[in-house]
């Protein structure tokens, strides 16, 4: 337990603005950068999450996340530490071991891939989850299919949230029932103390910008890069693209670097991926843009088939043409055994773009 302080060491007194950690970004689209987080950044986020997610001293967290990343090192650990709760610590994710320990736990946090693997375990049942009060997902998009299947199987609704190395947590779906419903496909509302805006007209898609006491101090030894990432009025440009719906829920559309511009038109991959993921035989998809001699970029989809299925590319394209503008429809579909991911479960689209860059002879 973390409820009492050890008398074997003298606590180090630190000021809120002193550097606490340098956390390197995931780097799915380029070179990783060292985000400098202060003690004040970490404390403000920990206190906010403790209150918002209702951390208690009798909580038991199943901790399976790597501690080189903000999700495992801060988001999961700090809530338990601040509340004086217990942690069951795993050095890696083992679905059978997690299921075996669920009956004595109350909180679990994981990336979407872990929830898919839990659903594949026969022992993952409502009975196994009887003491659980909170399942949190983040670090990568959670498929609506996984969201729905998990609720049906466990009786629990996953709480999806949004954050990044530079900011820790920014938004969260509601925890308390009185604060609203947890909506699949969204990351909820800005957390208390966090301001969030979208650089676009109301309801439209644009760049997400944030500010608050949780925002980092800058990138380690990269002053020019730090300056580039903040607006003139002090808002941090997350590099994510999203929108705020009429009910105030934040939707993440994707990374700005993943935006495809084909023939002068913008294509947001998440829109096309959501449609593909709902089609027969498709387990998941990644939509990318690769060099095209006529259009600048050509839209390409990379699919993973469901077990035992063989997706019909022509049929999928035909269905897409009935639902979205023609310029958004992939010019090619590829079926692969799995999508490349980093350690936090994010699809590495940069690797897919590199693999298919010569497809149209535009590289």
Residue ranges and their predicted role:
Residues 200, 212, 217-218, 225, ...:
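AMP-binding/adenylate-forming catalytic core of the ANL superfamily
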Residues 53, 102-110, 119-181, 195:
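Gly/Ser/Thr-rich phosphate-binding loop
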Residues 175, 186-193, 201-229, 265-267:
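Conserved ATP/PPi-binding loop(s) of AMP-dependent carboxylate-activating enzymes
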Residues 20-44:
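Conserved AMP-binding A3 loop
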Residues 139, 163, 188, 240, ...:
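Active-site glycine-centered loops adjacent to acidic/histidine catalytic or metal-binding residues
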Residues 43-60, 68-107, 121-123:
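Conserved AMP-binding/adenylation subdomain of ANL enzymes
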Residues 5-24, 31, 54-60:
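Conserved pre-ATP/AMP-binding loop-to-beta segment of ANL
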Residues 19, 25-28, 61, 67, ...:
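Conserved S/T- and glycine-rich ATP-binding loop of Class I adenylate-forming
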